[in-house]
Amino acid sequence: MSDSHLTAFDKASKAGFIIALGIVYGDIGTSPLYTMQSLVENQGGVNQVSESFILGSISLIIWTLTLITTIKYVLIALKADNHHEGGIFSLFTLVRKMSPWLIIPAMIGGATLLSDGALTPAVTVTSAIEGLKAVPGLSHIYQNQTNVIITTLVILIVLFGIQRFGTGFIGKIFGPVMFIWFSFLGVSGFFNTLGHLEIFKAINPYYALHLLFSPENHRGIFILGSIFLATTGAEALYSDLGHVGRGNIYVSWPFVKVCIVLSYCGQAAWILANKHSGIELNPFFASVPSQLRVYLVSLATLAAIIASQALISGSFTLVSEAMRLKIFPLFRVTYPGANLGQLYIPVINWILFAVTSCTVLYFRTSAHMEAAYGLAITITMLMTTILLNYYLIKEGVKPFLAHLVMTFFALVEFIFFWASAVKFMHGGYVVVILALAIVFVMFIWHAGTRIVFKYVKSLNLNDYKEQIKQLRDDVCFDLYQTNVVYLSNRMQDYMIDRSILYSILDKRPKRARVYWFVNVQVTDEPYTAKYKVDMMGTDYMVRVNLYLGFRMPQTVPRYLRTIVQDLMESGRLPKQEQEYTITPGRDVGDFRFVLIEERVSNARQLSNFERFIMQTKASIKHVTASPMRWFGLQYSEVTLEVVPLILSDVLKLPIKELVPVEDSEA
């Protein structure tokens, strides 16, 4: 990696500062909409809170943001970039060679992050729309929660509906809108605190610790389940590292944190001033003058939409990375924007929409959604901590020190997990079930791939080079295609899947002028695009290793076109002049891609568990994208061949001949 790239990545700019506000901080920036409301409602309402309770709550929020978001994510996790990319799968690719079991925390963390992403739009948009209950002239309409639900669903329909067109055209306003949002949080919060400056005593962690063990705290340690809502967006901050660069996050986070903390302090000051008023509105909206509330609701709705958009885009990226790491089924991916970073996965988009909409309809109010919110993300953070521990050791930190630091964060996060676990019976089971379903799919896909590698036999290409040459020159067979391309899952030291040679020589001899054996390897770097060619001492057999980053599309024909041109220009591959063509000077022949799918037959070698894995994976494949579409072959000539997973299983089965009995012997 060049020094200039590192400098650009670590450099901050005014434009980068604004962009970071629109991309990185949507989730954590909308937390003030519902965090204080959750704390107050769980304590029994505004009338039931005391000054010490409020001071302790604000102190817990401040120190949670400091320990988890600032220290763990901003100061430690942002250092763990994989060629400028962040997130749990990028972190996993950095450390996966250290231990094979690290795939487990990576899958669990990715699954819980996805399930959390399905709930975030429901919580944020509903919370924003519920602010209309505090707007004079509209409150009588939105006191009816059904109207809140209808408005929320309309916004969600529009939000998920525009994903297919790309969001670049509206993405340009995200940064400025969020700058206005955070500025409003800071300014309004500051003015609300002017009458109660004692609220700033909450900076002292004594008040946080005192509240945890105070009899005034009706929920005990379980209050941390509500406190954690303030920092749920910390994981997204790390995941979006590649979009804005480390330098811009370093510069923008202090501004964001100050504005968020001032907002919480301002709400706390309003509660202290109005705890005997009998007002039971969301402190976030109630703390603003009534004539400004309609503008605040509009701004909050925009901020909620931006936060939701960031989670949706993040989910697409997360699934895309998981597919390329071969731990998730293949789904069709499109790129509606001008760059590879703007991707769209239709199936995931509509699954997210269905889950989000059902969440709104099932829980109805943001208060009920908050009861379920945050449980999954505590698990994601714990999994990230495990991977960070290995990363620190890999980077040369002494194991004892790495274990000490990460054990501290793991302990803090486990306490938050334990405090949030009470949410399971209050709706948290929804995200847990969703996360378990995603983990199950990931496990099946990963385990199925390992089983295939275990049982599919390999043969040495060199041993069959002469046979392939004879077939190439044998005019008794019609020319199958000028170029025949086989995609191989593994190709090392001239070893290749037996099923490929079976297809060329046994199933139906395929005569061609050139045989291509292509293997796509996903690299730990995100944007690699390299290849290696071995002609095997011939001009008719070509081994191609494609090295593509885990964020690169695997459109094989486009890369192969470039490789063919390079080989012909260098003289390693003879030109294939075409007698009949509408393209003058065309010197590349026709191509046919042969895809081989291994299916489970009555394979006696498979255990019952392995057979269950393979049959389940086959069932999942029915609703996923075909390899043809995944490798960009939909506009190419393709042959799909099905072979048994274990070829030897069909070659010879024991069977006994029944000898007919002569009538005379009867």
Curated annotation (Swiss-Prot):
Protein name, entry field: Probable potassium transport system protein Kup
Topological category with respect to the lipid bilayer: Multi-pass membrane protein
Function text: Transport of potassium into the cell. Likely operates as a K(+):H(+) symporter.
A GO CC annotation given for this chain: plasma membrane
Pfam families, alphabetized: K_trans, K_trans_C
Record-annotated membrane-spanning stretches: 16-36, 58-78, 100-120, 141-161, 165-185, 221-241, 253-273, 294-314, 343-363, 373-393, 399-419, 424-444
Keyword terms of this UniProt record: Cell membrane, Ion transport, Membrane, Potassium, Potassium transport, Symport, Transmembrane, Transmembrane helix, Transport
Keyword Ion transport: yes
Catalytic reactions on record: K(+)(in) + H(+)(in) = K(+)(out) + H(+)(out)
Species the sequence originates in: Streptococcus pyogenes serotype M6 (strain ATCC BAA-946 / MGAS10394)
UniProt entry tagged with the keyword rRNA processing: no
Family label: Belongs to the HAK/KUP transporter (TC 2.A.72) family.
